Every structure is written in C-alpha cells, then in structure tokens.
C-alpha cells in the first residue's frame, strides 16, 4: 500500500507541474478516488489480519473463497489502483495525463504511463493471490455496517468510473 501512495503522489505532482485551474479539479478527483480505494483496501486488510492473524499479503490468498464481498472489493480496489478502465482509478490518471500532454509535458505523461504499467504487475499479483484457493484460512465475517461501508465505497469507484463527468462537475 505504501508504494501505491507513492505512485499516486507522482500523478498529483504531474498535475501540479501543469498548474492550470482545470487541473486542480482533476487532482481533487484523483485524491478522492485514491482515498476511497485506499480506505476500503486498508479496511479489508485490517479485517483479514484481525480475523486470521496473518499480517502479510499472503493473508489475502483465497480471500475470494472465504468472503466473496471482501474478495471482489479488494480486486476492484487493486484494479482501480492499477488504472484499469472503467474504474475511477483509470480516469483519475487519464485526466491528469491528458492535461500534461495538452501543456507539452508529454515525456512526463509517458513516464506516468510506464510507472502505471509496472505498478499494475504488483496489483495483478495480489489479485491472483486473492483468487487462489486456500483452505487453511477461516471464513471471514463482517458486520452489517462494515458490509455497507465496503459496498458504498465500491459503488463509488465503479459509478465514478462509469460516469466521471458527474463527479468532476460536482467538484467544480
């Protein structure tokens, strides 16, 4: 998760390099999307750690088998971090890269894309782990409030990815 924060900070810095009014809206969109995905992912990680006593990424192995909601939610968070369309994480990066290109910072946009591709490899490794079968981990239970919180966050990531202009216009 720390590397995710560093990569996201790079996109925010690209936007600040452009320093245009419109770009600030995209920074807010990016930070909002990233924050929602990070809060959900950390909430899931914390729940898994608490209920399984596994403190590493291997604790995610088989998550899809032991709690479908947590597994699907973590996969959506990882795909959003990776910037895979149609999730909000894609548009959060896309809008900033378009602004960079528009203001002749194409080389920085290319670096941003390359970093995103490299980071996607790590997210895809986590996703593969989530989908593997592991019968040693107990079933993970959630309270109704925790379930609602995770579902609301995932709905935000999907809807604001399918209709980013709605969120962007609200931020203006």
Enumerate the language-model features and the residues they cover:
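Alpha-helical transmembrane segments of multi-pass membrane proteins predominantly involved
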Residues: 1-172
């Amino acid at each position: 998760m720390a590397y995710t924060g560093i990569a996201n900070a790079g996109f925010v810095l690209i936007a600040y390099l452009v320093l245009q009014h419109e770009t600030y809206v995209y920074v807010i969109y990016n930070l909002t999307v990233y924050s929602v995905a990070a809060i959900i992912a950390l909430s899931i990680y914390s729940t898994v750690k608490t209920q399984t006593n596994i403190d590493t990424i291997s604790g995610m192995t088989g998550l899809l088998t032991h709690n479908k909601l947590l597994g699907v939610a973590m996969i959506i968070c990882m795909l959003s971090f990776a910037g895979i369309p149609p999730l909000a994480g894609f548009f959060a990066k896309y809008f900033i890269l378009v602004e960079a290109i528009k203001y002749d910072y194409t080389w920085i946009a290319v670096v941003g894309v390359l970093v995103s591709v490299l980071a996607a490899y790590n997210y895809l490794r986590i996703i593969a782990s989530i989908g593997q079968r592991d019968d040693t981990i107990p079933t993970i239970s959630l309270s109704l409030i925790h379930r609602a919180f995770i579902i609301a966050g995932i709905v935000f990531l999907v809807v604001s990815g399918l209709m980013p202009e709605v969120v962007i216009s609200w931020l203006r």
